Amino acid sequence: MSVRKMVAIDGNEACASVAYRVSEVAVIYPITPSSTMGELSDEWSAKGLTNIWGAVPQVVEMQSEGGAAGACHGAIQTGSLGTTFTASQGLLLMIPNMYKIAGELTPFCMHVTARTLATHALSIFGDQSDVMACRQTGFAILASASVQEAHDLASVAHGASLESRIPFLHFFDGFRTSHEVNKIELMTDDDLHAMIDDDLVAAHRARALTPDTPVTRGTAQNPDTFFQAQEARNPFYDACPAIVQSYMDRLAALTGRRYGLFDYVGHPQAERVVVIMGSGAETVAETVDWLVARGEKIGVVKVRLFRPFSVDAFVAALPVSVRAIAVLDRCKESGAIGEPLYLDVVGALARAKALGLRAGIVDPAVIGGRYGLSSKEFTPAMVKAIFDELAKANPKQAFTVGIEDDVTHLSLSVDRSFRIESADIKRSVFFGLGADGTVGANKNSIKIISDSPTIHGQGYFVYDSKKSGAITISHLRFGPRPIRAPYLIDEADFIACHHFSFLDKVDVLETAAVGATLLLNSPHDKDTVWDALPRPVQQTIIDRDLKLFVIDANKVAQETGMGQRINTIMQTCFFALSGVMPRDEAIEEIKKAISKTYARKSQKVIDANFAAVDQTLSRLQSVTIPGVLTGHALPPLVSAGAPDFVRNVTAVMLAGKGDSLPVSAMPVDGTWPTETARWEKRDIAQQVCSWDADLCIQCNKCVMVCPHAALRVKAVPAEAAAALPASMNSTPYKGKDDLKGSAYVLALSPEDCTGCGICVEACPGKDKATGARSLTMHAREDVVSACKENWEIFLDLPDVARTSLRPTVKNSQFMTPLFEFSGACQGCGETPYLKLLTQMWGDRLMIANATGCSSIYGGNLPTSPYAKDANGRGPAWSNSLFEDNAEFGLGFRLALDQHRSEAKRLLGALAPQLSGVLVDGLVANAANNDEAAIAAQRERVVSLRAELGGLTGWQARALEGLADYLVEKVVWIVGGDGWAYDIGYGGLDHVISSGRNVNILVMDTEVYSNTGGQQSKSTPIGASAKFSVAGKALPKKDLGQIAMANGHVYVASIAFGASDNQTLRALSEAVSYEGPSLIIAYSHCIAHGYDLTCGLSQQKLAIETGYWPLYRFDPRKMGVGPALSLDGVQPSRPIGDYMANEGRFRIIRDADPERYAMLLEAAEENVRSRWALLRQLAGVADEQEGARAAQ
């Protein structure tokens, strides 16, 4: 028997470790927060790791979760042992197959990271809404409450499914368990083999669908038999709970860890009991233990097997003394008398009474409550509030806990000061920025510390849906025994703030305990930092007697080649200051972790990290705390000029205090105001650009490529420029068009800039003698004050009239962007396209946005980057689902066309009472897209409303409501390649086949960027991505040529960094085309594995190597010449030049040179064949054929 290991891993890895080893086929699709399980399975399969039978499982990615369920269904029908991993909307797509699998009594186990379902809004965070939507599918539902349980009960689920023939849905709470890192004991292959009966595997094989012993399954049945067939499965469900318990007992015999279908924890004569499942059960159990030790007669029943629900087992778990029960559900079922678990408990008690199982026992009162929706915190203080409510003579029959419900008044009051954590647990909190490495370093820290046989660790990481550039908060606990505290730290003895600007924005010291240590990454040294701190921070440091240490981690990172990643430096400081383990030992372990973590990068990366570690401690400084307050007052989070909603709601969320907002503050239907990102001022850039007007050639390319619209330009009247302060540069406008005589003004919003440097990369204006550019990067501190003042002045300068501008790249940047300051990554390759759409058509723009990166940086609270013009018009934006975005956008078009048609009909009906010239003009220009014509049409609508005001009758009122639809609206359906190439492709294909006038923009990053970089069918040959770590062996799907085959679809392939003129031309032609348009836009991404400052040059290289052809296919040209125009240069460089720059290709080159050479050759052939076909379609003669013909 092999020896079991103690390891620090998260819930996803704990579960996947079992699922992979007891399966033969894993069919996967990425969705947060379950994706890691699929990623690990793919990685293990690529490495040749075997299951318990010595075979390497197949891991196959599908185009959607529905596809994954279908493939699993097929695999298990033919006798394989299958599994899949999913959550939320993905689980909903699997439900039809789940009914089939259960109805066919096919053993199967799926693992779910329980997550919120999208209702009024999407949420990636955890509750049990998705699992509860599956409770009538016929799947057994087994709940795990911790990382160890996610590991153990996965084996129970797989084993019990084989014996019971009931398929299992094994779940644990998304993020709270899936992403919590904890120290657990791993089951060995021998343990797992003892949990899986080979005879049952053979029986499953014997039932396989095969022509050797043919049967028919999946028949269509009629009323004479269907009902009876449904009831025929009853004995299997009746037997299932006992089978599950037998496997739990088998696990206990192997490992010593004992589980029950319902486990009771608490006083043996408890009078008040909570019933709960999932991670919250750990919080309740910990609180119960603490309160029972202090004399309370309380307890908790942990629900493990939710389906089939065993009345006998549940009643046996309840103390006979119980007088009041609170059932907690982590979901909301609107309109129901109660939530699912509550209803089951009430029903179980009624059934038990009818069966005499509780004869002579007083019936307890049962109340139901909701908690923890969308990962809302659930703490011991809230548990105490629930037990206090149960103690009342008339407790609330239905309640919520963790929020303030000032509308329906269901919420319980909570004493926030109630705490139960032991003093021997070390608690540390780290404030970082998404993609700065803080979270990764802290995960390594837990693993390093947990390697000690006497120390246990727990880590949990708080971040929003944005993957880069948002605040992350890491919560680490260490102690001498297993830690079961699935809630955030509220009293920390170590706090690290990795970005100095956070001190002005969030209450970093809110959880600081008396005497705690504060570590700051600071540009100020020990002698100057005190005066730079906000006054409230100084006050807290003094009041709580904090120890303060500083280090300029950014400077160390730059000097050691670490760029902007400060994680290793701050991690080293933590070990030096926290005392969790000896300093020298810690540094040695950090270096081991670095070597392991970056083994797939390069030795250069490893060496840079080593250098950073070695230089850190000499740069760490202790600060002597003065007894006086010298700091500045905290600036307001939003300015006084912000709208009421922004000041009263958005600002609270920006401060990290959104939990305090009451129910009454929330929009009831999920409708939120736009134009709120301008108040956020993230202020995260280390460097910002500075402009030398004398070197500027006024091309506006820098403004065009700015991903966050932080760099703007205006051409203003000379008299306005004359009034500008000396600190604000301007220069005479150099063009010969209508703007001649104006002053050219460039300005930057430093608090909205992310410091990506792409503007400098784009700048062609240079001093020929020195090579200096018109734009250069400077330390933020050197220029921020003047920049902020100049920005406010700039905003008040007059805008150029849109109607006076020809649609050129340069002129487009004089148009105010209505997409600004998003939460996208530094150097994002998607946002310039969206910004350009809003500059060109923003006041008439309707956007249907597929779920993905663009829906997160475009619609993730607390702010919206979409803005309004001076007239209050701007993009109307909505997100439906990942899979149906094309159809959703088509719905926009159908409604717009119907509204316009009805407006025209009403115009006709009211024409005798209206001006004939007005009516004719309105009808003739209802579909016009010309800028001047739009302005004229809007004036007509104003006149129409004036005339309608003098009319009576329903038709006049109806036309008033529809009049704006006589001005053409522009529909753009936007999303990424995961949507367009995979999950939404069927809908996209149907929409472009419909012939309707919609525009589709695919921002092609060639991976599922938002879920962490998994491969899509757009991923190119030779690239390593999650779900394809060994390098993709097949070429990228050619979406453009597929669309061109329709013949009636405008299709273009664009890359703004390589040809901004072609980009603008293609977008403009798409809008002008009266039919479906598809634009495929090259979008560089952090998932490509290089510094995105070089994104523009890499785009150009993509064109030069032929990797990304630029073209436009315009059906209007058919019959008069080739409809396809090739806009890019012919391939002039080997594609290897392009691939060598990106980490996604270099990983394969460095790890497996032989395979890389094979994939490179295949990529070169793919470029040749693709270009040959494009040249043929464009009617361009092959150069070699032309040469031979000339001979």
Curated annotation (Swiss-Prot):
Its cofactor is [4Fe-4S] cluster. Binds 3 [4Fe-4S] clusters per subunit. Pfam families: EKR, Fer4_7, PFOR_II, POR, POR_N, TPP_enzyme_C. SMART domains: EKR (SM00890). CDD domains: TPP_PFOR_PNO, TPP_PYR_PFOR_IOR-alpha_like. The keyword Amino-acid biosynthesis does not apply. Residues 687-716, 744-773 form the 4Fe-4S ferredoxin-type domain. Keywords: 4Fe-4S, Electron transport, Iron, Iron-sulfur, Metal-binding, Nitrogen fixation, Oxidoreductase, Repeat, Transport. GO terms for biological process: electron transport chain; nitrogen fixation; response to oxidative stress; small molecule metabolic process. [4Fe-4S] cluster 3 binds at C825, C828, C853, C1085. [4Fe-4S] cluster 2 binds at C706, C753, C756, C759. [4Fe-4S] cluster 1 binds at C696, C699, C702, C763. InterPro entries: 4Fe4S_Fe-S-bd (IPR017896), 4Fe4S_Fe_S_CS (IPR017900), PFOR_II (IPR033412), Pyruvate:ferred/Flavod_OxRd (IPR050722), Pyrv-flavodox_OxR_EKR_sf (IPR037112), Pyrv-flavodox_OxRtase_EKR (IPR019456), Pyrv/ketoisovalerate_OxRed_cat (IPR019752), Pyrv_Fd/Flavodoxin_OxRdtase_N (IPR002880). Its EC number is 1.2.7.-. GO terms for molecular function: 4 iron, 4 sulfur cluster binding; iron ion binding; pyruvate-flavodoxin oxidoreductase activity; thiamine pyrophosphate binding. Gene3D superfamilies: 3.30.70.20, 3.40.50.920, 3.40.50.970, Pyruvate-ferredoxin oxidoreductase, PFOR, domain III, Pyruvate-flavodoxin oxidoreductase, EKR domain. It catalyses: oxidized [flavodoxin] + pyruvate + CoA + 2 H(+) = reduced [flavodoxin] + acetyl-CoA + CO2. Belongs to the pyruvate:ferredoxin/flavodoxin oxidoreductase family. NCBIfam families: pyruv_ox_red. Oxidoreductase required for the transfer of electrons from pyruvate to flavodoxin, which reduces nitrogenase. This is Pyruvate-flavodoxin oxidoreductase. It comes from Rhodospirillum rubrum (strain ATCC 11170 / ATH 1.1.1 / DSM 467 / LMG 4362 / NCIMB 8255 / S1).
